[in-house]
Each structure stands twice: as C-alpha cells, then as structure tokens.
C-alpha cells in the first residue's frame, strides 16, 4: 500500500472515530444520567459565582423526594430551560432563585424539573 493511501486511510479512520465520539457521547451520557438533556451550557450570569456564563454542566435525573434546598436544578419554562438553585420546597411546587438575582423565580411545578 502506498504512503499516500495509508495517509488517506488514517485520515478517514480518524474522522470516523471523531464523528462517532461526537454523535454517541450525548446518547451515552443521557442513558447513564437518566435524562434526555445530559449537557447544558450556562447562557447568563444569573448563577454567578457558582456557574459562569459559558460553563458546561452535566444534568442528572433525580426523584422528587431527593430534591433539597440548595440544590441546583434545571427546569422547563416558556423561554426554554432555566438552571437555578432551590430556595423553598412546597408540597405542590418549588421556588428557585439565581444566585446573582435579587428576586425569587415564580413557582415551578415538580413535573417541570428535568
């Protein structure tokens, strides 16, 4: 086999492995962490200094009875998703707040927590 053909074959294998990693990593993480959304990017500074804009976070599924005050959660809302800290737990919902925010968020139903 010629040197250029070996180089081409090596490149094709490298690209195939790289594409496999990019494609399968989120699927593997979703299965291991028990959530359809295993990775999220922080897009605002509302959780500063704990989480900075541009940080990537892994999301793990937890049961409602495992949630506690101080946990950082991800929940669905009208704008998409929010990552904030739990400040109060109620029977029917919970209250969150960004660490850098002055006011609490509106109540979040437990079914909205990712």
Which role does the model predict for each range below?
Residues 32-34, 78, 88, 102:
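A generic structural signal for short, solvent-exposed coil/turn residues
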Residues 60-91:
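Extracytoplasmic/periplasmic/luminal assembly and interaction segments
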Residues 83-114:
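Extended, hydrophilic extramembrane loops/domains of integral membrane proteins
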């Amino acid at each position: 086999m010629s040197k250029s053909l070996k180089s081409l074959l090596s490149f094709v294998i490298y690209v195939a492995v790289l594409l496999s990693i990019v494609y399968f990593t989120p699927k593997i993480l979703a299965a291991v962490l028990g959530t359809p959304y295993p990775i999220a990017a922080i897009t605002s500074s509302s959780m500063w200094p704990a989480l900075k804009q541009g940080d990537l976070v892994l999301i793990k599924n937890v049961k409602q009875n495992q949630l506690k005050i101080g946990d950082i959660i991800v929940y669905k809302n009208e704008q998409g998703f929010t990552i904030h800290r739990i400040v109060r737990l109620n029977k029917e919902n919970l209250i969150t707040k960004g660490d850098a925010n002055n006011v609490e968020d509106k109540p979040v139903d437990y079914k909205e927590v990712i």
